[in-house]
Amino acid sequence: MKTGALFTCLVAGTVLSGAAQAADLVVGLKSEATSMDPQFHQLSTNTQVLLNIFEGLTNQDALQKVTPALATEWEAVDDTTWRFTLRDGVKFQNGSTFSARDVIYTYCRVPLVENSPSSFTIYTATITDVKPDGDNAVLISTDGPNPLLPTDVANLPLLSADAAGAEDTVTYKPGGECEGMGTVPQSADFNSPEITVGTGPYRLESFVRGSQMVLTRYDDYWGEQPDWDKVTLRPLTSDGPRVAALLSGDVDMIESPPIQDLPRIEQAGYSVVDALSNRIIYLAMDQDGEAPSIGGTDGKNPLLDKKVREAISLAINRDAIVERIMGGYAQAAGELLPPPMFGTNGRAVDAYDPEKAKQLLTEAGYPDGFEITLGTPNDRYINDAQVAQAVAQMLARIGIRTNVDAQTASQFFSRRNALDFPIYLAGWSASSGEMSSPLKSLVATYNKEAGTGPTNAGRYSNPAMDELLKTAMTTIDDAEREKMLQEAEQMVLDDFGIIPLHYEQTVWALKEGLTYEPRVDQYTIASQVHAAE
């Protein structure tokens, strides 16, 4: 790894001489948002662009500390009730006044979003009631203590009830049974700027899939005005064209420049900033019955056997991946979040031991291995397809003949959510900045109604872990909750229910005169890009 510990490695963008002259900013992104609907898909690509338009009751800063946004303060009234004081004088981009009605409408809509690849119900599952408290506050009740509610609501961007066509009065009821919702707009409707209405510093001008997203400054924004009149976000999914666009001046900033190109970029006078992120790159495995797509097993699913899953982990040389594939811009992972984040326990990285891996396969009844397909995106994570190819080669050395099926992110996520892959490579960035996020999303037993395991496409299930996690999430005492999260994570990792590979280190490249503070969550937020003074 090229920098220090997680929280000390964050550095501000280098300030170079001269200020940016243009009032417009063009950013080259490594992947494209799947929707303009802020409640459709828990995907950082979506979140980072929509944070320019929408805001929640709370926000998270570059280190994921919870800060005020549309709520100026909050307090726990009792074990199951929180009171959020709403910011006065806030206007949506359509001119309507922000009020408790918009909060109620937003939280009501979450379970009504159709065909969500990764539902936001994970943040609303405990909410039993949302109601006004006077003219400038809301009371949010939960079905048990929820110490993370102020963090959860940062992940629920608030919609304009007027723009969505709600009735004058919206009454909250759990499970999508709210009253006064009107005809609820779905994801495709948010391609229209008339529906995509928030309170943020930018408004949506246009979104052309495969081409660009254009934002214009919202002059009546309640907070600090951004530096740019117009922002254009272009998906440049191939590394070469993305770097070429920067060096030619077609874009002002890019995310995830290839590691091997950094010297050339810096020599050309551009600044480079980087930070270790909280994103874990991991392998998930089909642990839900038979897997006919796996060859050489007489129809059995070898991934149901813990010994096979452990063999896969021991076959992977994480240090080699970090150095050879990631160029040192990553850190080998032993947990679902990098220490010292809340809930980590310092578990060691699984040792590279191919001989023991072969022995475990033999003990499991697969001395000759088997054949399997590894699914991966090829444009979503840093060097994702290359990492998958390296993993495939390592697995082949212990007898697991691995075919890599690499696709664009949109194709990959669609197939992953259809449970097409017996094993797949993906990533997760903890929106809460602590261990409950990956546990609830990646390894909790899948239950659509309960909002658990929305991204658990391997269908791993550990009822004891589920129960411990449930208890942790209703424990107010931080020390006790952390112990429970540590134990819950240990249960999953001891079971090899999921295999951590590495934590990404995120890199940005900017033209002269621009600055950007790297974020732990890896977001590229245009409104936070500044012209050097």
Over which residues does each language-model region extend?
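Surface-exposed binding/hinge segments that line
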Residues: 75, 121-180
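Long beta-strand-rich cores associated with HINT superfamily self-processing modules
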Residues: 508-533
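Cleavable N-terminal signal peptides
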Residues: 9-10, 20
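Sec/Tat signal peptide C-region and signal peptidase I cleavage site
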Residues: 16-22
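Extracytoplasmic/periplasmic ligand-capture domains
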Residues: 60-62, 87-118, 129-131, 196, ...
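N-terminal lobe/hinge region of extracytoplasmic solute-binding protein
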Residues: 28-78, 108, 195-199
